[in-house]
Amino acid sequence: MKSILLFFAFFLVATSSWAKAPFKYVWGTAHHVLPETHSDESGYFSLCEGNDGRIYVGTSKYGHNAYIVEFDPVTAKQRIVVDAHKVCKLNAKGYAAQAKFHTRNHVGPSGVIYAGTKQGYRQKGDTSEYPGGYFITYDPRNDTARNLGIPYKKQGIADVVADESRGLAYIVTCEDQHWMLYDFAAKKFSELGPMLTPYATTLVDGEGRAHSLTKDFQLATYDPATKKVTQRPIEIGGKAFTRENGSAIPTWNLSADGHTAWLILMNDAGLISIDLSSKGNKVKGVNHGLMLKGENPDSRSALTIAPDGNIYTLISVKNTTGFGKGKLHHLCRYNPKKRRHEDLGVLAVKNPDFFDFKPANGKKPPWSHGYHTLPDGTMTPLHNHMALIATRDNTLYATIIYPFTLLKIDAFRKEPPAAGPAEKYLRSIHQHLDRIEENLPQFTELGEMTAERYERGGLVGFHWLGATLEQELIGRSGGLMHIGFDRPWKDKKLRSEAEKAQDMALVAWDADPKANDLKRLQQFKAAGQFVLGFGSRGNPRLAEHAKTCDAWVDLNTEPKDSDPGKLNHVVGAVSGWVWMAETLAAHTRKGRMPTMWKSWAMEDGRDWSDRFFRKVKYHKNFSVAPIPKGALGKAFLHRIRSQLLSLENTQLPTLHDFADLIAKETKAGRRTVVASSGHMVMHYVGKYSDSAWADNIEVHENVESQLNSFKTKAPQGGLVLRLGYFGLSPKVDDLFKLKKSRVLLMTAENPRADFASHFNYPDRLDLGMAFGDACVPIEGYPIALFPPSGIIKAAAYESLNVEILHRLK
C-alpha cells in the first residue's frame, strides 16, 4: 500500500511538471519595489520612463506618506527620489496623510516629471481631515522635487499633465473630478468647468488643446488660445459613447499623429480610437473590436502606445482554461496599420525568488497573495496589474500588487541600430564614469587632505598652464567660492607663513605638456605648495610631470587621446568635480560648511556673492549633517550619467541634423563659426580635430569686445553654431540678426523672458541642464552644488564633431 501511495505521489508531481499550458507565456523579470515605500504592497497608476531611461514608480503608504522610486534598468538599483511629506513639509498621519501617488507621472520635454498626491482611506476612529492633494514635480536633472501647492482643498489628485511650451498644467482631482488649470508663471490654479468622469486623465493634442472625458463621457476640450471650454458628444458606430456603469474607467493615450486618442475601459476589452480633431458638433470614434475575449475583463491604466505605433494592453480575464484557477493576465497588441489584434500571452515571472513568499519562520508575509503558480510550476499574477508603459526601446514595464512589483518585459524590445560615432563617444564617457566611481576612495582621500589644508588657512588655486580644468573649477555655480590664489576669504596680506605653507596648486593637461610646464611645476614645488595633477599616465610625455606632482589623478585616456573623440577635457572636468565633492563632504564630517557659488543667472545670485565672497570662509547660518565618504561624488556621477543619457535619448536626431548641415557647408568650402560661451570653450573649440570645420569666436553677452569681434570676423549670412548656456540673450540675438547668421543653437532652458529668444530658432538642440546649473542638492543647504554644464557642453560638442568628421570622410 505504501509503495502504491508513493507511486501516485510521484505520478502527480511528474504530470504536474510535464503539464503544458494551453496558452503562450510572456516572461518578465520581477523587481520588488522598495518595501519601505509602501504599506500594503500596493501602488496605482504611477509609472513612467524618464528622459534618462530610468523608470519612476509611485507608491502608497496608507496613513503615512507616498513616494516616487527611481529604478535603473542597467543596474536594477532603486532609490527614493520623492518623499511627499518631506517636500511638502508635512508630518500628518492617518487619513490626513498624503497616502498615494496615483497619477500617471507625466514627463515633459524638459525631463521634469509631474505628479500629484492623493488621500488614502479613513480607518475607524480616525477623525483627521485630509487637506487636499499636492501638485509635485521631480527634476532628474538636479535631483530636486518641488511642491506647487494644493489645486483644490480636500480633494486628492488623480491626474497631472503639463504643457511646458505654454507654461500650463492640467489637473484632475478626486474623489470629485474637478478639471483644474495651473499657470506656472502666475503660480495660480483655476477651475476649467465641466465635472469629469472618475479617474479621468488629460491629453494635450498637437495643437495645444487639452481634452478630457466628462462625467457622461462627452469630450471636454480647452483651447488655451481662446481660453474657452467646449463639450461635444462622442459618436461610435452611430451611437453615443456613454458610461454604462461605475467600473467603466477609461485609460487613453495619444498617438504620434497628435490627434488620435486610443482608449480602453477597465471593464471592457474593446479598443476605441477617438479623433480629437473632429469638426462639427460631434466627435468621431471607432470601435476596433476586442483586444481579448474572456470573462470579466479588467484593464487598469494598462494601455500604452509603443514607439513603433503598436498599442499594447494588459487585460486580466477569468481563467476558464482548466489549467489552474483564478485570473490570467494577458498582454495584447494591436497594429493600427494592419488592423490586427494579437494575444501575445499570459504574464509569467522569470525569477519567482524575487520575493520571499515562504520565509524560514513559516509565516506567509502579509499582502503577498497577488501571485499564484500554475500546474506547470509557472508563477503568474493572480489579482491586479496597475499600470503598463512601453519605453523608447519597446521594453514594457508593468506594476503588479501583492507584493508591489515592477515587472520588466523585454521580449518585444527593439534591437537598436549599430552605434554611430556620437553614441560610441558618449558610451566611452560612461565607461570613464564607471572607472571614476570605482576610484572614489582616492578622491575621498584627496578631498580630506584638501579640506584639512583649507582649514589650516591654505589656498587652493591654479597657475594657468592652459588646461580646461583650470577654467572649469573656478567661479562656477555650486562650486567652492574661495578657489583660486587670487580669491582668498581674507586679505592676503594678513596670511601667515604657516597658512601659506598649506597652499595647494591644481595642474592639469588636456594634451601634451608645453615646453616649460615641467620647469614651472618644479617652481611651484620649490615655493612649498602641494601640487595635485590631473592627466593621463598613458601619455609618456607626462611621465616626469606626474612624478613631480605630490598626487596625481589619472584620467586613464589613450596616450595621445582619441581625436576625434577627445576625452581628456571631459574626463578631467568630471574628475575635478568629484574631487571637489569629496572635499566638501570632508568639511561636513568636521562640522564645517564652506561658502559656495550661486549662479549669477538667478535673480539673487549676485546678492549671494556679495554676502560671502572674500568675506566668509565657513557658513554660520547653515547646518549640514556629515556626508559619508564617497556619497557626494557618487551623487554627482549619478547626475552626469542621467544628463548624458537624456542627451543621447532625446537630442541625437537634432545633433545628426546639425552634422549634416555643417558637413554640407564644409564640403562647399565654407567654414562654420562657433559662437562659444562658457568656462572651458577657449581651450577646446577649434583646437583639435574640429579645426577641419570650426572657427571659434567667443561670444559672452557681457563682454563688449567679444561682441565686436563677432561683428568683425563672422561672415555675413554665414552658418553659426551657438554653443551657449541658458537661453539666448537679447544682445547675442540682435547680433545674429545683424549678421543674418544661419544659426544652429545648442543651449538649455531659461525661464527669464529676456533670455527666451532661443525659442525663435527652429534649429535648436537642448543641452538639457536645469536652470541654475548646479545639480546635487544636500540637506540643510539652500542651493544645489556642482554644475554639469561644462561637461555636458563639451560632450555634446565633441559628439557633434565626430559625426561631422564621419560625414567628411
Predicted regions and their residues:
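Surface-exposed loop and turn segments in beta-propeller and other repeat-based domains
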Residues: 31-36, 82-97, 149-156, 196, ...
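Blade-loop segments of beta-propeller domains
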Residues: 77-110, 118
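Short, conserved, GDST-rich strand-edge loop motifs in beta-rich repeat architectures
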Residues: 115-132, 314-329
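Residue-level detector of Asp-centered blade-edge/turn motifs that repeat once per structural unit
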Residues: 49-52, 107-110, 162-166, 205-207, ...
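Repeated scaffold domains used in trafficking and secretory/extracellular systems
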Residues: 41-46, 89-105, 154-161, 196-207, ...
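Blade-level signature of beta-propeller repeat domains, shared across WD40, Kelch, NHL, RCC1
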Residues: 376-417
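Glycine-rich phosphate-binding loops that contact phosphosugars or nucleotide phosphates
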Residues: 449, 455-588, 667-670, 676-806
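Beta-strand-rich domains and repeat architectures in extracellular enzymes and scaffolds
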Residues: 33-66
